[in-house]
Structures are given as structure tokens and as C-alpha cells.
Amino acid sequence: PIPISHPNQGRGYRFEEEGRSFVFLTDNELTYRHPGGLEYEDYQTFAENADLLVHDAEYLPEDYLLTRTWGHSVYTDAVRLALDAGVARLGLFHHNQDRTDEAVDGMVDDCRRIAAGRPLECFALHQDMEIAL
């Protein structure tokens, strides 16, 4: 486990089996270091070359002006982490409950635009979703 950057603290996890890896980092604010949290580079190293990264992507950049220090990330920061860590697939997670499905789809489209030309698959997680590694 790895400490996450959140006011209530917590842990992120990396699971590896049969040559596949899954990293789970929810409630993790990448651009603000809460007590007990780590530096961006530590999360990058933890997620390095993962087959799947599930990361907190609650906010839009404009939301973050009002929510900085709340313990959640802007979706574009999650994409940057996935790209910097060489992750194969990024699942956006912990969507803002006020965000419409269409708005989440727009976030995914933007993630794909940001990652264009690089080997990163972006998608939004939803309730009851199952993912094969």
C-alpha cells in the first residue's frame, strides 16, 4: 500500500498477478500534499507500467479553484499521472455526483485527446463495471 493525499488519509493499492498489474488510487489529490501524503513522483513510481490505473478524477479544472485541499484530483492530473507512469489503461473514478453522464463522457473525450498518439486507453468507470486485465 501507499499513503494517499487526502485530509482523512487512507491507502492506495497495487495488485500484481500473472504478469498483470492494477493500481487503485482513489481520494488522492495529486497537486496538493496533505499530511501523510506523498509527492507526485511517488505516485508516478507506484503506478509505473501498470496495466490498469483507477484514479480519482472528481473535478474539472474550473472546479478545483473552489475545491483545492479537499482531497480529490482534477481528471487532467490523473491523465498526466497515467502518461508519466507509462500506464496502459486509465479508469476515471470518483465522479462528482452532480456531473451528468454527458459531462463525464466529455471528460473521457478530453482525456483521449490529451493522450492522442500515446499508448493510453482512457475510460470512465461506472457502477457494476467489470474490467478484465
Predicted regions and their residues:
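Short, solvent-exposed polar/charged micro-motifs at secondary-structure junctions
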Residues: 10, 131-133
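Metal-dependent phosphodiesterase/nuclease catalytic metal-binding core
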Residues: 1-93, 104-110
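Conserved short loop/turn motifs at secondary-structure junctions
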Residues: 96
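Short acidic, glycine/proline-enriched helix-loop-strand junctions
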Residues: 99-129
